[in-house]
């Protein structure tokens, strides 16, 4: 009797196991059929007892897969068989969100009719309307709003709305549709970006036009003070910059980079302002020009629209870095490493520093003062002669600006009235250590000089010729010598240009300039000056 009961139990267990196996097999076949978009196989699996809401281990149901595959017929078949339109994966991804992301209004309609929630959210807080806005299908956007989707809902992580997402992707038709149904054009993300600023940052021309037509502020700025105009410029979107100016952007709008004019001058010749970490993330360096408007053309447009050609770069200076041998950059723009502050520098000064004679000529055409120095008394001629030259980062032979171009800038600065023997003026202070000692290191009291705010304190009372030695561009040295540069001029430390050629500690590296030394020695001998 016991053996008979045992046999019956085993048989029953086997039958139950077989039934479960058959059902699981049918479920697997259903999912496989949906993924391969085989409608006949889908119907057969359902007939064989497959669970219509069968799901993968991550909770993705057959209906979700059908929506992902954009297959309306299979979606219809599954819904007809009783599939739950609201079933979500373990990541809270729903069939509606997937269909909206695909921009499939027909499937979205089926799902909504079957009970899907127009305001359901993913695990990240993204709504179906946000997904549709990213895709850009205006019909899907309209449908969701008409069926109750909240148009101004923001996802919780970055605070972005559907309009921000549509604008950033350049989905102009979706932008128009959202605006038609009351999307807030002035909403801000947690990072301080509006739909308009997202569109500008991503160079979405049609979205920009649509947003401006619906009340976006063309002079809007981020929380750090970056204007839409400057955002366009520092991303290389000069065509967008021109568009914004045509739409009424203020060419003199306040900006932490000094001005839009300063920014476009840097973008025209950025040098290589990238340290190792930045290069690892962006080996191509600064943004390249996009569109058919050049930096020079945009600079002209800025000036024609009334940009102040003599505006000065003013920002809170921080101390000189003894460890790096550099002074601080202005905020929100990477100008590379340098020895002298940009504080007080005009657009003309910066163009001269970049060796950019065409830009210098344009600025003078619009009444720029070609002689205004920075706060440390560094003149445009000194800047052009490369007094603040950081090899490999300042615009120069290694970063796209030839020595001939820089020489042209030097000649132009001199022709426009700069004093060839003017000296920098960092104020009065004492540096401890003999001149020869300070060629190889900083003054012994350097720690007391870090807050002075002008740059490397050893650069006080330098001339343009001192600068030409630092860059080791010998044609510039020769030009200055030929045009009356004082050969035995001494800076505050006591260095003459010739003394510097013997070897100079800059940015934690020791450099010698033998070719330049030869030019200076010969010239000094001709003038009867003592040669060290």
What are these regions (language model features)?
Residues 1-10:
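Bacterial N-terminal signal peptides that target proteins for export
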Residues 41, 73-74, 106-107, 139-140, ...:
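Conserved ankyrin/ankyrin-like repeat signature
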Residues 23-65:
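N-terminal segments that cap or nucleate solenoid repeat domains
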Residues 32-36, 65-71, 98-104, 131-137, ...:
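Ankyrin repeat A-helix N-terminal signature
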